[in-house]
Amino acid sequence: MNTTDRQITFSALSCLLSYPDEEWRAELPDWKALIQEIGNRQIREKLLHFFETSASYSPEALIEHYVYTFDFGKKTNMYVTYFNSGEQRERGIELLHLKNTYEQSGFLPTEKELPDYLPLMLEFAAAAEIEAARSVFEKYLSNVRELASRLEKNDSIYAELLHVLLAALENIGVRESVEGAVQA
């Protein structure tokens, strides 16, 4: 995956996994045009399929699905360190480590979200050097896989985006790390 494809893929995933409000809908045509440029056919087609699927929902129904899936679902939230430690003290250390990693890479995250919020992590992956993105996602690959599995079990339309993410991570050479594995 070349740099441009990586940046478009991770940026698009960050957007598409964000809250689907009016602003989100207004940006979709621009994202669709950018996604058309992705060289990897599988990733491009799955992202475009998500547009078709999400368009079959009314704006209100899509928001309801999003909120039910990510905001009310403890097992399907997008805070990837939550799978390891929930609200435990150890999570704070992981969050601080992530924030420091971002800053060391020149990425200054917003204070509106915790550093382990998946769309924010995807923004980082789009902006950072590939080695830094790889390092962050290697630690949490099992968490991303677990989230994808849970979304699939819930028949969420967002499962497809997580499968795109897993394919993109594999494409940039992300391999499993024991350190960040989901605890059974």
Curated annotation (Swiss-Prot):
Keyword Membrane listed: no
Protein's recorded name: Probable nitrate reductase molybdenum cofactor assembly chaperone NarJ
Gene name of the encoded protein: narJ
Name of a matching Pfam family: Nitrate_red_del
A GO molecular-function annotation: metallochaperone activity
Single GO BP term: chaperone-mediated protein complex assembly
Compartment(s) of residence: Cytoplasm
Lineage per the UniProt record: Bacteria, Bacillati, Bacillota, Bacilli, Bacillales
Record organism: Bacillus subtilis (strain 168)
GO cellular-component term (any): cytoplasm
The family this protein is said to belong to: Belongs to the NarJ/NarW family.
Coiled coil: none
UniProt keyword list: Chaperone, Cytoplasm, Nitrate assimilation
InterPro entries from the UniProt entry: DMSO/NO3_reduct_chaperone (IPR020945), NO3_reductase_chaperone_NarJ (IPR003765), TorD-like_sf (IPR036411)
Major location (coarse): cytoplasm
Gene3D superfamilies, A to Z: TorD-like
Function: Chaperone required for proper molybdenum cofactor insertion and final assembly of the membrane-bound respiratory nitrate reductase.
